[in-house]
C-alpha cells in the first residue's frame, strides 16, 4: 500500500533538524488534544486509547539497530533501513522502558535518504533526518535539507545524478537558500494506529495499491 502523505510542511531559517522534530511534536500534541476535547464521542465509540505524552524520545538509527539486536537476540539483516518488524520491536522497547507510544529514530544512513538530505557533519555516512514511529509503524519522515550549492552538487554526483538535470532546483541554492527542512506525515497511518486497524487501506477514503486504481 502506497500511502499518500497529505500532511507536509517545510521550515526555513532553522538552526538544525531538531527544530523540525519539535514542531512535529507540537503538531501531534495538537491533533491528540483536538480528538480528546472535540471528538470525545467518536473516540469512545471507536474504543480509541489516545496517547498521553509531553515529549517524544529519540534514538539514533545505529543505536536502535544495536538495541533491537541485543534486546531480542535478533541478527541485523539490513544495515541501511528499519524492517517492519524492527519498527514494531523498537516501539515495543520504548513503550516498556519509557512508556512512550511515539519514538523518533534519527540519523538514517545516506544510502537510504534522498539526494537533498543533509549529511551529518560528525559522521557523513549518516544524515540529519528522522522517522517518527507510532505504535510500531512509521507515520512520518523528515529532516534537514542541503542549502549550500556546492554541497548539493557534490551530493548529486555521489548518487550518480547529473546536476544539469536539476538546473532549476539548483538555481535556488546558488542565489540564496536558507537552512531549511521539512516533514511528510501519513495521516491515514496515524489514524490506523489510533483505532488499532492493522490494514491502512481501511483508514483511507480511496486506497490505492497494485490492484486498485479506481475510484
What is the predicted role of each segment?
Residues 2-16, 23, 100-215:
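TRNA-recognition modules of translation machinery and tRNA-sensing kinases, especially anticodon-binding
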Residues 26-135, 158-171, 175-176:
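Metal-assisted phosphate- and nucleotidyl-transfer catalytic regions
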